[in-house]
Amino acid sequence: MQKGNIGVTTENIFPIIKKFLYSDHEIFLRELVSNAVDATQKLNTLASISEFKGELGDLTVHVSLGKDTITISDRGIGLTAEEIDKYINQIAFSGANDFLEKYKNDANAIIGHFGLGFYSAFMVSKKVEIITKSYKEGAQAVKWTCDGSPEFTLEEVEKADRGTDIVLYIDDDCKEFLEESRISALLKKYCSFLPVPIAFGKKKEWKDGKQVETAEDNVINDTIPLWTKKPSELSDEDYKKFYRELYPMSDEPLFWIHLNVDYPFHLTGILYFPKVKSNIDLNKNKIQLYCNQVYVTDSVEGIVPDFLTLLHGVLDSPDIPLNVSRSYLQSDSNVKKISTYISKKVSDRLQSIFKNDRAQFEEKWNDLKIFINYGMLTQEDFYDKAQKFALFTDTDGKYYTFEEYQTLIKDNQTDKDKNLIYLYANNKDEQFAYIEAAKNKGYNVLLMDGQLDVAMVSMLEQKLEKSRFTRVDSDVVDNLIVKEDKKSDVLEASKQEALSAAFKSQLPKMEKVEFNVMTQALGENGSPVMITQSEYMRRMKEMANIQAGMSFYGEMPDMFNLVLNSDHKLVKEVLADEEKECSAAIAPIQTELEDVTKRRDALKKKQEGKKDEDIPTVEKDELNDLDKKWDELKQQKDSIFAGYAGKNKVVRQLIDLALLQNNMLKGEALNNFVKRSIELI
């Protein structure tokens, strides 16, 4: 028996391995099964070039559980005592590297270029044994044992067949790995597509009301996964079946892209466009990254462009190591090339579907939209390509490319400053009246109700020359597209004041909601009262919900305009009745108010151009008193108008109709509206 110390520079290597080699201890199973697959593939390579002339036989890798042990067994090339000394005792040398160098033209399928992979066993084990016999003629089987210290033993043993058994004596604090369900889940996660059969226990079948083991190995992996095959050999059903295996609970994918590139990097895989039902779906299933069919991670940020991390599927590249780190991904040139390549393949595929089957593309647009919009918002190169196939949808359900839509609206939706005005709604039902008003003017209205449409609107205003997006409920229809300078409202100021004060007094108090009341001449057939919201302020608040650094806007109240149509019969009747009821009480207040205004204006004019210290205190006090008196008289007037409005059911009814149209009438206010409506009928 040989005893010795492992060739490391410090005796603290094992605690370091145990704690820091990999972030997840479960990785040990991936590493050891991958090593077993390596050894098997090496034997296949040697047989293919006639350096091994024996019988290959069954090459299945077996994983088995004992009371306190996990054993990984292969029938690969095995190791001699000298090879154990070189590859096991001298940490950081890897047999796969030497093997690749010697057989680089024939050994493309070797996984194990990871150096420290074997030592991951010590993350979960108090003792590890290697029982191995080389394929070489006359080789002596040996057993290597190490308890996690730098000391090891190496002795000759009897072993009938070539290959290697790795026996792990599991630590007391890692007993979870002795559970069949835990190992089964890890094998499914990491080894589902390894290129050599992996067996874990025996297949089971129902017999006499219970599950019993059969004699057949329970092979857990598909050795020739779909992405390794040629697209010409595959049917649509093959791709759909593979998707169902990857994501059993998901709907059928929209379509897929089969990737296969050999230069300047190696990459294969299949990416699927899933149906995204809600925000909850966005991170539920992720793209799986493999290295020569060994599962690496589902955190593919950096390898896949951000907007495509929403896709599903698999990527496989030997150019990305198993112990991949975020800093590696950010700096590696191959990774950047892969990301660019994937983005190009996706845009080419989308362009191809749009060009060859536009009907299918339009049918799937609502599902594709989030991917395409996300890409256009985050990647300039993708925007340049996607603008040719990205679509607008109008409220009638018709689809247009950007260019087609510009052609459609340029004659009728260009304002006096030569800006092209894109009208849009984000809820067909809630904004129905505004949409209909716009359509009655001959305008087309887009439906922009997607999760990213707020950001898209802002971006498109920057990208599309002399273009502006305006939501249909942001103003009265005549003001949405101003084609000529308008005459000012003909209603005199005192009448506007009376109307505004009456209606403002009856507006409901709502949390973080403010109203500005105004009058406009909108024609006899226009709505008597409308509620609009400034495009700018609404958009800023919407952006605050999705973009960091804009919380200021999110905290501001919602600002709405209550627009009174001075041409409408009902508004005229309210005004006439208000003047009749209030004129006697208002007249003396108005006379006094005009006198105060005249004196205040004269005093302000006298003080114009003077510094504050040059204005006599008496004048300052007088102006302050006049300001207070003006406010007091104004409040008296408003109180009289409010008293009138409180008794006039038509005022509150018109307000409630406008609120109801905007889905802003709820609870007690809605109940009162219904009662009042019955009384008025």
Swiss-Prot record:
Pfam families in UniProt: HATPase_c_3, HSP90
Record has ATP-binding as a keyword: yes
Region (C): 546-681
Molecular-function annotations in GO: ATP binding; ATP hydrolysis activity; ATP-dependent protein folding chaperone; unfolded protein binding
Gene3D superfamilies, sorted: 3.30.230.80, 3.40.50.11260, Heat shock protein 90, C-terminal domain, Histidine kinase-like ATPase, C-terminal domain
GO CC list: cytoplasm
InterPro entries: HATPase_C_sf (IPR036890), Heat_shock_protein_90_CS (IPR019805), HSP90_C (IPR037196), Hsp90_fam (IPR001404), Hsp90_N (IPR020575), Ribosomal_Su5_D2-typ_SF (IPR020568)
Keywords, comma-separated and alphabetical: ATP-binding, Chaperone, Cytoplasm, Nucleotide-binding, Stress response
Localization terms from the record: Cytoplasm
Residue numbers spanned by region B: 327-545
Highest taxon of the lineage: Bacteria
Chief place where the protein resides: cytoplasm
Subunit text: Homodimer.
Role: Molecular chaperone. Has ATPase activity.
Protein name per UniProt: Chaperone protein htpG
Organism listed in the record: Bacteroides fragilis (strain YCH46)
